[in-house]
Amino acid sequence: VFGGEPGSRLVDLLAKGAEDQQDVTDRLGYQVRRAVEELVGAFERLDRDSHRELLKGVGETEVYEGVLTVMMRLVFLFCAEERGLLHLGEDLYDRFYAVSTLREQLHDDASKLTEEVLDRRSSAWCRLLATFRMVYQGVAHEDLRIPAYGGTLFDPDRFPWLEGRQADGTNEPPHISDRIVLHLLDSLQVLRQGQEARKLSFHALDVEQIGHVYEGLLDHTAKRALKPILGLVGKEGDEPEVDLETLESKVAEGRDKFIAYLKDQTGKTERALGNLLDQATDAEKLRKLRVVCGDDHDLFERVKPFANLIREDSFGN
């Protein structure tokens, strides 16, 4: 990962011409969309574990809007910190509040402890919540003074469930893992194209360019699946999601028709799809599949025949 060099700034990348600009915006849009999916999924799992109390009364559209608001808050903070509008560079702010330094801190922890350990911690999410509150309400402390900026973007009462606040007075921050926060920050700070990873700077990025990068996110929303849905391999940014019952019905029509259906859905060749169906599923992939299926053995057995067709998330699961 390269940072701070000429050409690494997002504004420089966007200035390279219409074709390059489209490549950058498409790639960033894809990265951020995957991160949004992860955070939406995390809140869904926490809501399920809380017996539907965490998101009680919260509609699907509001969940998506709340998660998208988190991403836009992060973009705002990156821009503000890099323009010197906050206290980036001061020890107290850098260690406990800055979003620009948080990613490296989490990467250091992951290197020392492994990313899996980050799954069991949620201090980074609490730090983000504190920073969001700080920007909205301000801070008056002898070692750190920040005016209250207010505004709707950082208003904590727009999406109180982001903080774990519920109508009954419950106020416990949701356990969004440090690993997920790391992936959120990575999606915004690092442009990944093939084997190249380029650290981005938001310095001098104007509102129009931010809107150009993220406008595609407004075309999406979140829907709660009422039956098992499998995310299949496919063209990046256009990977299909198909319900398990449909896949099972297509298999029943015969191998040739099933492969033809998969070709239409994934864009892969019939030969490549045939190879995926024929190759043995390795033990590690089956282990991950069992984890995803939880205690539902019947679901695991139903999904198992399609294991090699399922795409991995950004965690490699």
What are the functions of these language-model segments?
Residues 1-317:
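Charged, often flexible domain-edge or linker segments that flank or initiate folded functional domains
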